[in-house]
């Protein structure tokens, strides 16, 4: 993460143990002791780079297209889509009643697995539109919205996960009251369509996105992420040993895993195919006021996974530009205990690839 602002979080899916937590830029902790500690603290506090902010648990970002995995799980589990048979059109985006949400060029129409592989925006926009409009199933858009939110909360979003570190933020998952207040009760699926692709009012921490990767790796459950592996002569607190199951069905997870694997083989995460780790992944390009953030969420190997990773590089552009390569290198290092010669060169390349942050500087 040299010359970059962002975060990397890695979790062991089978235990919830945090394997890696990087927040960039960092600072030398030795500067916080001795006679100059007060002066140094003031300097760090005043820095526009915010080095004292642990972005892994305090940074709240749009999840971008990594969030499409949660949408596929929800729509499939609720019967809004049939993963094998429901196919939605995409003509360079979602186009309906004057609303346009852009997308890149790819085959159309698509079912769930190729929609995840290609990161199709239109597919998930259609899914949310039909869920919010299913009055015969939910009775009202408000009930549909709260049902959607319940799924997101069950997957670890909208509240603190409970990691054993101070300062964790909760992110944001809106409910029906949120939109009733914002739009005075006059809203529908089209009004909030951007949440289906991880934009709009949705925010998450890198820890929550890494936990999503661990949950998908486990096909439907997670452990509360924790830094402490064990305490001598004491059992680990039951809080960190209890499985938390989501509302999504196991079969829905199988389809999402297939989509993430397809993405790693020939989709938006195809960079992962250069690493011998049988990975599954999902890119994200999180829009914000400046340049887009480069986001990645994935795990490896596909079966009996050992590691789940989330990467956020602020203003890094496409998810495949920084997020996927960095995530792939971390997974390869952890699984094999080393990097191949080609990966070593790749790591050095990205170490020295700095991002210009305008007036902020480095």
Task: Label each region the model flagged.
Residues 6, 11-66, 70-319, 354-362:
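Beta-lactam-recognizing serine transpeptidase/beta-lactamase-like catalytic domain environment
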Residues 321-325:
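Generic recognition of short, well-ordered alpha-helical segments
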Residues 237-244, 326-362:
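Short, gly/Ser/Thr-rich active-site loops of penicillin-recognizing serine hydrolases
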Residues 1-4:
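Serine endopeptidase catalytic core focused on the charge-relay Asp
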């Amino acid at each position: 993460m040299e010359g970059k602002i962002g975060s990397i979080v890695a979790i062991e899916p089978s235990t919830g143990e945090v394997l890696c937590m990087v927040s960039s830029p960092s600072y030398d902790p030795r500067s916080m002791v001795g006679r100059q500690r007060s002066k140094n603290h003031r300097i760090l506090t005043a820095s526009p780079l915010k080095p004292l902010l642990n972005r892994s648990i305090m940074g709240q970002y749009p999840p971008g297209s990594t969030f499409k995995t949660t949408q596929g799980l929800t729509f499939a589990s609720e019967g809004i889509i049939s993963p094998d048979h429901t196919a939605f059109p995409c003509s360079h985006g979602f186009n309906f009643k004057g609303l346009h949400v852009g997308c890149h060029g790819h085959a159309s129409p698509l079912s769930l697995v190729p929609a995840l592989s290609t990161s199709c925006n239109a597919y998930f926009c259609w899914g949310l539109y039909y869920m919010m409009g299913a009055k015969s199933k939910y009775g009202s858009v408000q009930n549909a919205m709260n049902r959607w939110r319940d799924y997101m909360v069950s997957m670890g979003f909208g509240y603190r996960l409970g990691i054993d570190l101070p300062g964790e933020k909760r992110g944001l998952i809106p409910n029906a009251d949120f939109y009733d207040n914002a739009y005075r009760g006059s809203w529908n699926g089209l009004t909030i369509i951007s949440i289906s692709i991880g934009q709009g009012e949705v925010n998450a921490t890198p820890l929550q996105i890494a936990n999503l990767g661990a949950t998908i790796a486990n096909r439907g459950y997670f452990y509360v992420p924790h830094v402490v592996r064990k305490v001598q002569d004491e059992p680990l607190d039951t809080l960190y040993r209890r499985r938390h199951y989501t509302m999504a069905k196991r079969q829905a997870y199988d389809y999402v895993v297939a989509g993430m694997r397809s993405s790693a083989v020939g989709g938006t995460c195809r960079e992962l195919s250069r690493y011998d780790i049988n990975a599954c992944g999902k890119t994200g390009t999180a829009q914000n006021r400046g340049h887009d953030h480069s986001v990645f969420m994935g795990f490896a190997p596909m079966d009996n996974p050992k590691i789940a990773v989330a990467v956020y590089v602020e203003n890094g552009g496409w998810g495949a530009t920084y997020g996927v390569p960095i995530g792939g290198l971390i997974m390869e290092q952890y699984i094999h205990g080393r990097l191949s010669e080609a990966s070593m060169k790749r790591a050095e390349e990205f170490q020295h690839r700095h991002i210009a942050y305008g007036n902020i500087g480095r």
